From Swiss-Prot:
Task of the protein: Induces sprouting in endothelial cells through an autocrine and paracrine action.
A single Gene Ontology CC term: extracellular space
Annotated glycosylation sites: 164, 192
Entry protein name: Angiopoietin-related protein 2
Organism: Homo sapiens
Single GO MF annotation: signaling receptor binding
A GO BP entry: cell-cell signaling
Post-translational modification: N-glycosylated.
Disulfide cysteine pairs (residue numbers): 278-307, 430-443
Protein encoded by which gene: ANGPTL2
Keywords tagged on the record: Coiled coil, Disulfide bond, Glycoprotein, Secreted, Signal
């Protein structure tokens, strides 16, 4: 029985300890149940579970809880959670501060960007105003350009009218001069007729027989040499302005006179022409400077030219002459092509005539110049010829020689330009500024077809005088200029 009692005692003690543990658990689990009720409940449960075993009941005095029950087993977890929460809060606070600083920075940037946007808007507004002002100024400029162009057109029309009027005046002056020549011719003829009649009357009085005396034809007045074959070929001569003027000046060939009367020396021992150039006329014995009929090789074109047989060594064909300003050289293309002026005064032979002359062999060019103080100089070029009209009479020059200075080589290889045919290399029309026709470059070192100013130095908006830049400069208009050509024997003048 003793071991059994000891065993029961240990069971009772374990039960009591379990009850205490259950009480603590009960206190933690619920706040409404009392410890006593908990013990009785356990007792009844154990009693019901084992009725066959012996049971012992231990009455343990009830303990009152006067303070808070601390459970040490859970305290580290709570502290750990609190620490975690504090760290998270600190991280969140730091993140919030960082976000706040970023927001403030963004606000500052937005404020700055807002200022820039306002400035950009202001600049755009100013740009629109400026564009409007520029457009307005551009329109004003266009109106001004159109107005000036209209003025230039009116000025060009006036210049053309002046040119036409000048041409009409020149034609009238030429006709008047021709009438004077005809009047002088008729007066001389009438005088000769009177002398012939008087001689016949005297002769009749001396002859005693009644045999009638044949009436001699009237003697011809003295005249410039004219080929007798001219009347047969007059219809073949080109009908330009120069040739028209010359046709009016042609005098009829002399009629045979009586042996007893005085007459001009016969020229039947000399060839009558036409000649290929003035040198051939000189070689045929015609050594007087005058008008000659010329027919270049390889063409049926007949032309009258002035042959200078006095300028050593003679045989020079004059293609241009300026001496008194009586002829206007500000002409159009067609006039420069055919020629114009008075062949015994100021004149231009014509581009087409010069082309045919210079393309029948090697010709040289001689330019003689004189200023208003009487100084004379010359410029000679070893070769001179023109290309055909299809090349706009392009200039071809050879080596220079002379004492006037070389102001023509710069124009070598250039095409001829007039007011209505612009072939120069300048952006504008050089003929408009130089007031003539020439082989302009951009524009001129020489302008021998320009305006003839009296006195030398002239005042003009442009350099439009008759000048040779290497001799007296571009603002000095020369007094006399002659351009003449001659076959080149490979020797300088």
């Amino acid at each position: 029985m003793r071991p059994l009692c000891v065993t029961c005692w240990w069971l009772g003690l374990l039960a009591a300890m379990g009850a205490v543990a259950g009480q603590e658990d009960g206190f933690e689990g619920t706040e409404e149940g009392s410890p006593r009720e908990f013990i009785y409940l356990n007792r009844y449960k154990r009693a019901g579970e084992s009725q066959d075993k012996c049971t012992y009941t231990f009455i343990v005095p009830q303990q009152r809880v006067t303070g808070a029950i601390c459970v040490n087993s859970k305290e580290p977890e709570v502290l750990l959670e609190n620490r975690v929460h504090k760290q998270e809060l600190e991280l969140l606070n730091n993140e919030l501060l960082k976000q706040k600083r970023q927001i403030e920075t963004l606000q500052q940037l937005v404020e700055v960007d807002g200022g820039i946007v306002s400035e950009v808007k202001l600049l755009r507004k100013e740009s629109r105003n400026m564009n409007s002002r520029v457009t307005q100024l551009y329109m004003q400029l266009l109106h001004e350009i159109i107005r000036k162009r209209d003025n230039a057109l009116e000025l060009s029309q006036l210049e053309n009218r002046i040119l036409n009027q000048t041409a009409d005046m020149l034609q009238l002056a030429s006709k008047y001069k021709d009438l004077e020549h005809k009047y002088q011719h008729l007066a001389t003829l009438a005088h000769n007729q009177s002398e012939i009649i008087a001689q016949l009357e005297e002769h009749c009085q001396r002859v005693p027989s009644a045999r009638p005396v044949p009436q001699p034809p009237p003697a011809a007045p003295p005249r410039v040499y004219q080929p007798p074959t001219y009347n047969r070929i007059i219809n073949q001569i080109s009908t330009n302005e120069i040739q028209s003027d010359q046709n009016l000046k042609v005098l009829p060939p002399p009629l045979p006179t009586m042996p007893t009367l005085t007459s001009l020396p016969s020229s039947t021992d000399k060839p009558s022409g036409p000649w290929r150039d003035c040198l051939q006329a000189l070689e045929d014995g015609h050594d007087t400077s005058s008008i000659y009929l010329v027919k270049p090789e390889n063409t049926n074109r007949l032309m009258q030219v002035w042959c200078d047989q006095r300028h050593d060594p003679g045989g020079w064909t004059v293609i241009q002459r300026r001496l008194d300003g009586s002829v206007n050289f500000f002409r159009n293309w067609e006039t420069y092509k055919q020629g114009f002026g008075n062949i015994d005064g100021e004149y231009w032979l014509g581009l087409e005539n010069i082309y045919w002359l210079t393309n029948q062999g090697n010709y040289k060019l001689l330019v003689t110049m004189e200023d208003w103080s009487g100084r004379k100089v010359f410029a000679e070029y070893a070769s001179f010829r023109l290309e055909p009209e299809s090349e706009y009479y392009k200039l071809r020059l050879g080596r220079y020689h002379g004492n006037a200075g070389d102001s023509f080589t710069w124009h070598n290889g250039k095409q001829f330009t007039t007011l209505d045919r612009d072939h120069d290399v300048y952006t504008g029309n050089c003929a408009h500024y130089q007031k003539g026709g020439w082989w302009y470059n951009a524009c001129a070192h020489s302008n021998l077809n320009g305006v003839w100013y009296r006195g030398g130095h002239y005042r003009s908006r442009y350099q439009d005088g008759v000048y040779w830049a290497e001799f007296r400069g571009g603002s000095y208009s020369l007094k006399k200029v002659v351009m003449m050509i001659r076959p080149n024997p490979n020797t300088f003048h």
